[in-house]
Amino acid sequence: MATPDGAGPHPAVLILRGVVGPDDGYTEIARRLAEWGYVALLHGWKVRGANPPDAPVYDDLKGALTFLRSVSLADQRRLAVFGFCRGGVHALMAARAHEEIRVIVVFHGFAFRSAHSQPGAQPYDLAEGVNAPMLVMHGTEDEQAPVADMRRMETRMRELGKVCEFRFYDGARHGFAVRTHPGYDEHPAKQSFDEAKRFLETHLRRLD
């Protein structure tokens, strides 16, 4: 966990990683959030296997939410989730079940089931039950979640009248925002974190 200076309470962000991690790349992201003025908690899977089903991972992250609620520095009224890679799906699952999650930010996330032969709802099905504002940032060359699927999800979200923003980065691959990921790309990484900071300031920090 990384915490900002000052007595608080501060808005808080739960960071949900993908299959790779947690590692120094995610630790750097937590520290960056603390520099912005947010309590940042990095969730690491405790379930067995490198690529476990979503349900036990979600059950485990509920414990992380419970812990974050116990942190005196964290403002329980201002809670966001950052989902990276498969953590984007877990962010949707968490926001559907926990109304206290006020903002969702997703980096190169939402692996669609047709690509991975995994059972369960598609990301756009999960998103139908989410009311929190959502920012989604994706690379056009993502090999894990094809950009065509993401554009269909954008269309579906707008049809549902959701508060959402989508940003697409030309040439960026899966993992572009995490420094230790093979797909890391400095320029779209900087752009995406600038967007994330703006989105948090607009939809989370200003909440009463």
Task: Enumerate the language-model features and the residues they cover.
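Conserved alpha/beta-hydrolase
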Residues: 33-50
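Primarily recognizes the serine-hydrolase "nucleophile elbow" in alpha/beta-hydrolase
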Residues: 63-129
